[in-house]
Each structure stands twice: as C-alpha cells, then as structure tokens.
Amino acid sequence: DRRLRQMCIRDRSNILDYESLPVDDFFTHILHAATESTIGPSLPALQRYDEIVDGTRNILDYAVKNNVKRILLTSSGGVYGPQPATMSKIPEGYLGIPDPLDPMSAYSIGKRAAEHLCSLYNQRFGLESVIARCFAFVGEDLPLRAHFAIGNFIHDALHSDKITVAGNGAPVR
C-alpha cells in the first residue's frame, strides 16, 4: 500500500512548470489550492486565466501519471457570476456565469474552466475529483488592505476602534 504523504508543493515546485513537480514522492490524494486571487494590475487578465487553467492541467496530468486516486480542486463562488437581484441566495446547481467578454472575469472563468478540466479528466482517465467552490480564505498571506472583506475587517480590528463594513448588508453567503 502506498502511504498518504503530506507535502506543500508550493515550497518545492511551480505548478506551471510540470518538470518541477515531485518525482519520488507517492501521493494518494491531491489538494489543488494554488491560485493568485488578488484583483488589480498585479497580474494581467490573460496571465491570470492561463495560470489557473495551465496549472490545473499540470496537476491533473501529474495525478494521472502518478496514479493519484482523488483530487480536491478549490474553486470559487465567483464561477456563479453576479447574484441576480431576484435571488436571495445562489443554489449550488445555479448555472449563471460571469461575463466571459469582461477581462475582469478572468479569475472566475478560469476557475470554471479548471472545473471543466476535472470533469474531462474524470471521463477520460477515471480521475475522481471533488470541487469546492470556496470563498473568503483566511491565512498568513491574506492582504489586509485589498478587496477581501475579512482582510479589511482584520486590518480595522488591529488598527482602529471601529470595523468598517462597506456595502449595504444585503449580500448573503
């Protein structure tokens, strides 16, 4: 039996460079959570899209080549697109989509394409995948002054007596 080993690939590898992925390690499962998610000029839209899709394809190819049983892809609630005003919440099966003609949708459309790749690899190679459409990750690399509400709340708590909530309170998650 192969043993389940834990490894943070980001410490040793670059998912955009297939050759940098581990050679002598044995994995039964992969958690693919590598994505640049900041908004703004730090990463051009085409590069953001390519990194999501190409990185996912490399991870899937690696999984097939190394007989990995299952992959967990962290996707994004952004794949649903904007929440229609007529919906109080978005059901998981909702088939909305961000505007594919808007370059600002590169992250969300890239995540949707990554999900589709997982489906194709399941059909072609039998690679089981689970997709988690997450939002609001919190960790040491979270920008405290960007477009992430939780980061802004943490910044305000650390540097002010008041926590500012931007918006009208209508969004529900």
Residue map of PLM features:
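Single conserved hydrophobic/aromatic residue that forms the stacking wall/gate
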Residues: 1-9
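NAD(P)H-binding glycine-rich loop region in Rossmannoid oxidoreductase-like domains
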Residues: 15-51
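A conserved pocket-lining segment of Rossmann-fold NAD(P)-dependent short-chain dehydrogenase/reductase
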Residues: 41-42, 95-102, 129-143, 152-173
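SDR active-site strand-loop-helix element
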Residues: 30-36, 71-77, 132-134
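Small-residue (primarily alanine) positions within well-ordered alpha-helices
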Residues: 5, 34-35, 63, 114
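Catalytic helix-loop patch of NAD(P)-dependent Rossmann-fold dehydrogenases
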Residues: 46-58, 65, 70, 79, ...
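Helix N-cap/beta-alpha junction loops of NAD(P)-dependent oxidoreductase domains
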Residues: 37-40, 82-83, 140
